[in-house]
Regions:
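Extracellular/luminal Protease-associated
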Residues: 140-141, 200-314, 318, 387, ...
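Basic helix-extension-helix modules of the SAP/HeH family
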Residues: 1-49
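Noncatalytic luminal/extracellular "stalk/propeptide" segments of secretory-pathway proteins
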Residues: 120-251, 258
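Metal-dependent peptidase/peptidase-like ectodomains
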Residues: 329, 371, 425-543, 548-550
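His/Asp/Glu-rich mid-to-C-terminal helical/loop segments that flank catalytic regions of hydrolases
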Residues: 547-586
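Secretory targeting signatures
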Residues: 1-2, 38, 43-104
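Short helix-loop-beta-strand segments that form the rim/entrance of peptidase-like active sites
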Residues: 406-433
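Soluble metallo-hydrolase cores and metallopeptidase-like ectodomains found primarily
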Residues: 216-240, 307-389, 404, 408-414
Length: 586
C-alpha cells in the first residue's frame, strides 16, 4: 500500500495490519504508518536456479506419499487437509484474531429510559425560575433552589449526595431595567413624563425588556436620564477601530452582521476607549424564524479574563451593555441615528458586576470497587431572561433519568467496578465557572482516576423535523470511546428502532490537540475535564442536538420541549456508562 492508503485507514485498521505481520501495534497513527511503510520496503527473498536442483523428483516423491492410504479411503493428503481445516476453525472460534475482523467482546445492554419522566423533571426545574424573568441565573436564589432540587432527586434514587459551592466572579441583575426614547413636544420644551408631557405632545417609546432588548454578560450599570441627552455613535458592524476611538463618552451602536464581532471584543473596545455604553442589534441570527420577521435579542456572555485585561486589571462597572432585536433597532435608528433631532435616551441598568457570588455543584455518587470514576453532567443554570427549556434543562433531565436508571441497575446487579457519579454545574453560561472550579478542586483525583466524562448540553432535537431537521451528533476526543459509541448506537438502532429511525444520528471524532482544527472545542462543561487535568488530556463524550432556534432567548420555553429526542443520547450514553461501570477492560 502507499502512504496515502495508510493515511485513509483508521488507527484500529492500522493496528490490525501490523498485528497480522507480527509487528508492534503501539504508538501514534503516524508511527504506525511509518512502521508499515518500513516493512513494505524490506527486500523480498526470491529463489534462484540452484534451489531448483532435483525439484521435479522431490515433487514426484511427495505426491506419491500424499496418495498413500492411511484410514479406509483417506490418504495422507486428505488427513492433512482435515487437520488444517480443524485448526483454522479453532483459531477463528477460540482465538478470534483481529486480522479476521474480531475484537473484544463487550456486553452492551441497553438501559431503559423513560422519556415521560424527563418531562416531569423539566417542568419541575422550569418552575424554579425567576418569577418575572423566568431564568435560573448563576449566583441567584433560583440557582440555589435548583441545586437543592437536584440533590433531593439524587438522594431519593439512593446516591450519596454531595454539594459543592464556589465563590466566582458573577454579574447580577438587581431589578427591572428601563430603556426608553423621548421625542419632546412643545418645540422641544415639553417634559417627557407626566401629564404636562402628554399635553405638550411628547412621544415616549418604551422598549420591552426580554422581548426588545436583553442585558449582556458582565454588563455594567447605568442611570442615564432623558435630560442628560447622552450622545450615540454609529459604529457600523463594530469592526473599524477608528470608529471605536471616536466614540469616547458616547453610547456605541453596533449592527451585528456576518462579521459577528463577539461580545468580548465589543466590550473590550468599549473599555479601552471609555465608551458610555454599548447597544448591539441582532440583524442576522434566526431572523423571521421564531417571532414574525423579527430577529429576537439573544443573551451572550463575555470572557471575564479578557475584559479585565482590556480594562487594565479591573472589571468596568459603568459601561452598560444591551442587545436589541432587529425591529427595536429599526425604531432606535429612525428616532436616534437617522433623526434630524435625535430622541433623548433613558437607559437604567441596575446590575452589579464586580463582586463574587456563590454558585453550586450538586453531585450524587455510588462507590465502586476501584478508585476509577465515570462522571456524567450537565449545567443547571440558564440565561437570566428565559426558562432555558432546551439550554440546558434538557441536559439536566437526561442526566437525572440516566441516574435513576443506573441506580436501579446497581440495586439489581450489585456494586460496580468503577464509581458512578452524576453532577450538574452552575456558572456555565458565564464561563464554565462551576465545572472548572470542581476540576481544580479535585485535580489530583481526577487526573489519576477519571475514566470518562459524559456531557449533556442541548442534547435536544426540536419536534419540527420538516423545518428544523432531525439530527443530533455524538462526539468524543478518543478513538476507543468513539468505537464503543458507534457500536452501541448500532445496537440502539436495531433494538429501539421505533425512536432511532426518526432521528439522523451522527458521529464525530475530534481527537486533535488543543488548537488544531479537529480539537474538541472548549464551549461546554467537558472542557476542563479534557484540558485542565494538570497536563493530562482527559477523555470525554458529548452530544449536541438541533433545531434550537430559540437558544438564549425568552422563547426557549417548554412549548418546544421534545422529550422523545432525549431518549437517543440518554440511552446510548447511559448504556456506555453501564458498560464502563461493570467492565474494567472497557
Amino acid at each position: 500500500m502507499s502512504q496515502l492508503d495508510y493515511n485513509n485507514m483508521l488507527v484500529a485498521e492500522l493496528k490490525q495490519e501490523l498485528e497480522s505481520i507480527g509487528l508492534p501495534t503501539s504508538g501514534k497513527k503516524s508511527e504506525l504508518i511509518e512502521r508499515l511503510m518500513a516493512h513494505s520496503k524490506e527486500p523480498v527473498m526470491i529463489s534462484i536456479e540452484a534451489d531448483l536442483i532435483d525439484e521435479e523428483s522431490r515433487y514426484d516423491m511427495i505426491i506419491s506419499r500424499m496418495k498413500t492410504q492411511v484410514i479406509g479411503p483417506l490418504n495422507i493428503g486428505a488427513v492433512i487437509a482435515i487437520l488444517l481445516s480443524v485448526l483454522m476453525i479453532s483459531t477463528v472460534l477460540i482465538i478470534q484474531p483481529s486480522w479476521l475482523g474480531f475484537g473484544d467482546d463487550y456486553d452492551y445492554q441497553l438501559i431503559d429510559f423513560d422519556q415521560s419522566q424527563t418531562k416531569i423533571y423539566a417542568e419541575e426545574l422550569v418552575a424554579l425560575g425567576h418569577p418575572d424573568w423566568e431564568g435560573r441565573m448563576s449566583g441567584t436564589v433560583e440557582e440555589a433552589n435548583t441545586s437543592l432540587y437536584i440533590l433531593d432527586q439524587l438522594s431519593e434514587m439512593g446516591y450519596e449526595a454531595q454539594s459543592y459551592s464556589y465563590e466566582v466572579p458573577m454579574h447580577h441583575v438587581n431589578s427591572e431595567p428601563s430603556f426608553r426614547l423621548c421625542v419632546q413636544g412643545g418645540l422641544g420644551f415639553s417634559p417627557c413624563d407626566g401629564p404636562i408631557g402628554q399635553v405638550g405632545g411628547s412621544q415616549v417609546t418604551i422598549f420591552q425588556h426580554r422581548v426588545d432588548y436583553v442585558i449582556q454578560g458582565l454588563s455594567g450599570q447605568s442611570e442615564y436620564m432623558f435630560d442628560e441627552d447622552i450622545p450615540v455613535t454609529d459604529l457600523g458592524n463594530g469592526t473599524e477601530e477608528a470608529l471605536w476611538q471616536s466614540a469616547t463618552g458616547t453610547l456605541g451602536y453596533v449592527r451585528m452582521d456576518e462579521s459577528r464581532v463577539s461580545n468580548t471584543e465589543m466590550y473590550s473596545y468599549a473599555a479601552q476607549n471609555d465608551l458610555a455604553g454599548i447597544i448591539s442589534v441582532n440583524k442576522i441570527i434566526n431572523c423571521g424564524q421564531i417571532e414574525g420577521n423579527d430577529c429576537v435579542p439573544i443573551f451572550k456572555g463575555t470572557n471575564y479574563d479578557a475584559l479585565v485585561s482590556a480594562n487594565g486589571g479591573t472589571i468596568p462597572t459603568e459601561i452598560p451593555f444591551i442587545a436589541m432585536s432587529r425591529d427595536a433597532g429599526d425604531i432606535f435608528e429612525a428616532l436616534v441615528i437617522n433623526a434630524t433631532e435625535p430622541a433623548s435616551i433613558e437607559l437604567i441598568i441596575d446590575v452589579t458586576n464586580d463582586e463574587e457570588r456563590t454558585i453550586y455543584v450538586p453531585c450524587g455518587i455510588i462507590e465502586g470497587r476501584s478508585s476509577e470514576v465515570i462522571i456524567a453532567g450537565a449545567h443547571h443554570d440558564t440565561v437570566y431572561q428565559g426558562e432555558g427549556a432546551v439550554d440546558d434543562t434538557s441536559g439536566v433531565t437526561t442526566v437525572l433519568e440516566m441516574a435513576r436508571q443506573l441506580a436501579e441497575i446497581v440495586n439489581n446487579t450489585g456494586m460496580p467496578e468503577r464509581t458512578i457519579q452524576f453532577c450538574t454545574w452552575g456558572g456555565e453560561e458565564e464561563g464554565l465557572w462551576g465545572s472548572r472550579a470542581y476540576v481544580a478542586e479535585m485535580q489530583s483525583s481526577l487526573r489519576n482516576n477519571l475514566r470518562l466524562y459524559l456531557n449533556f448540553d442541548m442534547n435536544h432535537v426540536d419536534a419540527d423535523f420538516q423545518n428544523r431537521g432531525n439530527s443530533l451528533t455524538l462526539f468524543t476526543n478518543n478513538e476507543d470511546d468513539y468505537g464503543h459509541i458507534k457500536r452501541i448506537a448500532n445496537l440502539y438502532t436495531e433494538e429501539r428502532d421505533e425512536i432511532a429511525n426518526k432521528y439522523d444520528i451522527r458521529f464525530s471524532l475530534l481527537d486533535g490537540a488543543k488548537g488544531e482544527s479537529n480539537e474538541m472545542p472548549c464551549n461546554s462543561d467537558y472542557c476542563p475535564f479534557i484540558y485542565e487535568l494538570d497536563g493530562k488530556v482527559g477523555r470525554a463524550v458529548s452530544c449536541y442536538g438541533s433545531g434550537a432556534w430559540e437558544y438564549h432567548t425568552y422563547l426557549d420555553t417548554m412549548d418546544r420541549f421534545n422529550e422523545e429526542s432525549l431518549h437517543v443520547s440518554g440511552t446510548i450514553y447511559g448504556t456506555y456508562m453501564r458498560l464502563l461501570a461493570y467492565d474494567m477492560n472497557a
